[in-house]
């Protein structure tokens, strides 16, 4: 069974193909906003619409496949930016109608988790999903991913991106801020807003910008921001490990590329005899392969829709999604 997956939730448009549960390849293109600006949903959507046909053709040609070889089409149905989501959904519906094949709506966050589990051979981990749109500590229980802790305002990646943009470090913000932080050998005190199991990152950005305006060297502020943001995550991860007793920690999402985050989470997890497994860099950011893979799992368990009944959801909680395929991944592929 050949599944084509379409990702278009934010700044990246990507298509991936999975055959019988194995990732074959993916291809994508990322919208880079003008210097000093954030992602404009309409401009991201125009970018996706402009590049989608060529990406689809190139991927099929690269794999020696015809469009008619596709058995199922999956698409990221949310959460995300409405105009960008709709570009992927329209393409998915068009393909489903043209080919007469099933259509599978996929939750973007669940897809991040499943590609991380697939690539790390993790069975029943505590998951740390960190990206521009997600900051969630979650684990599986009773048919769904249950949230042990999450951001109460902005996601960690978004927060660092905003800071980087405001101080002129460019986009994407996380690697730029981490690079700047390398020049510092000290840190300054930051608030650590942890409310129960939940986190707040909006205030960290405000505090960091105030420090820059007051004359604190930029590398020192960058280092302090990064260390505080990551140690806040580690605190919640430790609490979740103490509660769940899980022995695997999977880090998924674009911020999983951070070497410093890996170090901090590995140290925290080691205190609970848990092993940290990191999604490979090529699958850390938004990608079509994770949509195709999750679409494959979902379709095998009877989850699909028709073009007339398909949807996009700009807001869609992770713990509102059934994952009946969860234990299928516990057997090595």
UniProtKB/Swiss-Prot annotation:
Binds 1 Fe(2+) ion per subunit. Required for the formation of a threonylcarbamoyl group on adenosine at position 37 (t(6)A37) in tRNAs that read codons beginning with adenine. Is probably involved in the transfer of the threonylcarbamoyl moiety of threonylcarbamoyl-AMP (TC-AMP) to the N6 group of A37. Substrate binds at residues 129-133, 161, 178, 258. Its EC number is 2.3.1.234. It catalyses: L-threonylcarbamoyladenylate + adenosine(37) in tRNA = N(6)-L-threonylcarbamoyladenosine(37) in tRNA + AMP + H(+). Its cofactor is Fe(2+). Keywords: Acyltransferase, Cytoplasm, Iron, Metal-binding, Transferase, tRNA processing. One of its GO terms (molecular function) is N(6)-L-threonylcarbamoyladenine synthase activity. The keyword Acyltransferase applies. It comes from the Archaea. Fe cation binds at residues 108, 112, 286. GO terms for biological process: tRNA threonylcarbamoyladenosine modification. It is found in: Cytoplasm. Disulfide bonds: none annotated. This is tRNA N6-adenosine threonylcarbamoyltransferase. Coiled coil: none annotated.
């Amino acid at each position: 069974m050949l599944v084509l997956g379409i990702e278009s939730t934010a700044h990246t448009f990507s298509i991936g193909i999975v055959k019988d549960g194995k990732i074959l390849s993916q291809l994508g293109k990322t919208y880079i906003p003008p210097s000093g600006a954030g992602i404009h949903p309409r401009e991201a959507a125009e970018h996706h619409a402009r590049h989608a046909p060529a990406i689809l053709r190139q991927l099929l040609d690269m794999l020696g496949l015809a469009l008619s070889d596709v058995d199922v089409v999956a698409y990221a149905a949310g959460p995300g930016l409405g105009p960008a989501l709709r570009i992927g959904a329209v393409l998915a519906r068009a393909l489903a109608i043209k080919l007469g094949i099933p259509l599978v709506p996929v939750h973007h966050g669940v897809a991040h988790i499943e590609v991380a589990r697939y690539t790390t051979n993790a069975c029943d981990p505590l998951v740390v999903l960190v990206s521009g749109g997600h900051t969630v500590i979650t684990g599986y229980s009773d048919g769904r991913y249950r949230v042990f802790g999450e951001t109460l305002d902005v996601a960690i990646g978004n927060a660092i991106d905003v800071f980087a943009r405001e101080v002129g470090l460019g986009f994407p913000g996380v690697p730029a801020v981490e690079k700047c932080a390398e020049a510092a050998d000290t840190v300054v005190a930051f608030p650590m807003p942890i409310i129960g199991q939940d986190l707040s990152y909006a205030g960290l950005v405000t505090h960091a910008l105030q420090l820059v305006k007051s004359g604190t060297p930029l590398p020192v502020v960058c280092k302090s921001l990064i260390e505080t943001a990551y140690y806040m995550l580690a605190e919640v991860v430790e609490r979740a490990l103490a509660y769940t007793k899980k022995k695997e920690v999977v880090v998924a999402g674009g911020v999983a590329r951070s070497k410093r985050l890996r170090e901090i989470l590995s140290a925290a997890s080691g205190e609970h005899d848990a092993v940290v497994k990191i999604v490979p860099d090529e699958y850390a950011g938004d990608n079509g392969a994770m949509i195709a893979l999750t679409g494959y799992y979902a379709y095998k368990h009877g989850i699909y829709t028709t073009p007339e009944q398909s949807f996009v959801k700009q807001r869609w909680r992770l713990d509102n999604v059934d994952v009946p395929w969860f234990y299928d991944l516990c057997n090595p592929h």
